């Protein structure tokens, strides 16, 4: 490999950089094509990040997982594949994104400095400050805004009102499933019955409607707590084999494994000590940006 020298090194690897494959029996036996979503194989699927996966037009595809990544992938897969099986253990809460083109007249009306003001308001929102819908108005901030409104009206304890606000939000999301998915049995399987932040909330305007397509089938594996096995030709779930040409793993990333394993590169400080040894008793840094003994090394995420 190449050897490079630099005065400053910035680590922008983030916590989710090592893909995690599920421990499904037989995963190595599959003779079709397979890949993890973060290692998307466009040579096989065709198309690009915005869809148009023409290489799947004659393929039966399975995607395992229905988390935040799958919510983004499923609409394009359903649109392009001959047949799509979506294997779901626990449904995600999928709220409306309501993404739309920016109104040119509105954009022209913005005063100089609006970007900085929006950044300030966004920071305040995440620190628990007041949320101004004129600057930040999305699904992430709506729950907090609704909770604050309830507290102001009643004066009751925050914890009890938080549960009420959360329930109302989730009821709205479950109602969206009923309004969108035509088959009541499929709709029921797609409903999330838990607090909104039990799993990462998702927002998409096309995911739920994808299950109205004739070429898309939701395979609920909640009873068996996941896919049972993978064979040479497909996936076994609920005692049934689903022959497929391609398996896509939307199974997330390693989060709780060691930092050394996730980063995958050795880092030594001025005393010859590795950063992993330095952090054996726990990660510590200055403002989450610099580490004593490792000059000119910056942590950016």
Residue ranges and their predicted role:
Residues 70:
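N-terminal Rossmann-fold NAD(P) dinucleotide-binding loop
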Residues 1-34, 38-39, 43-44, 49-58, ...:
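N-terminal FAD-binding dinucleotide-binding subdomain shared by FAD-dependent oxidases/monooxygenases
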């Amino acid at each position: 490999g190449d050897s490079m020298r630099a005065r400053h090194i910035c680590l922008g690897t983030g916590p989710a950089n090592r893909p995690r494959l599920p421990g499904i029996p037989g995963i190595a036996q599959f003779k079709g094509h397979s890949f993890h979503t973060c290692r998307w194989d466009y040579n096989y699927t065709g198309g690009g990040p915005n869809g148009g996966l023409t290489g799947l037009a004659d393929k039966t595809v399975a995607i395992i997982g229905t988390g935040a990544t799958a919510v983004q992938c499923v609409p394009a897969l359903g649109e392009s594949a001959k047949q799509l099986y979506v294997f779901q253990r626990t449904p995600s809460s999928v709220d409306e994104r309501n993404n739309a083109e920016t109104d040119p007249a509105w954009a022209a009306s913005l005063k100089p400095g609006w970007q900085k003001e929006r950044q300030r308001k966004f920071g305040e929102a995440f620190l628990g400050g007041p949320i101004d819908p004129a600057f930040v108005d999305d699904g992430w901030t709506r729950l907090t805004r609704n909770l604050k409104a309830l507290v102001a009206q009643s004066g009751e304890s925050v914890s009890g009102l938080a549960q009420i606000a959360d329930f109302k939000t989730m009821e709205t999301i479950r109602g969206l499933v009923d309004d969108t998915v035509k088959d009541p049995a499929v709709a029921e399987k797609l409903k999330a019955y838990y607090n909104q932040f039990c799993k990462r909330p998702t927002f998409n305007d096309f995911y739920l409607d994808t299950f109205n397509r004739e070429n898309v089938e939701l395979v609920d594996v909640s009873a068996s707590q996941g896919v049972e096995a993978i064979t040479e030709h497909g996936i076994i779930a609920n005692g049934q084999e689903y022959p497929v040409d391609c398996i896509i793993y939307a199974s997330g990333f390693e989060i709780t494994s060691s930092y050394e394993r996730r980063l995958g590169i050795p880092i030594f400080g001025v005393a010859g000590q590795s950063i992993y040894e330095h952090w054996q008793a726990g990660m510590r840094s200055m403002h989450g940006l610099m580490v004593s003994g490792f000059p000119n090394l910056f942590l950016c995420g």
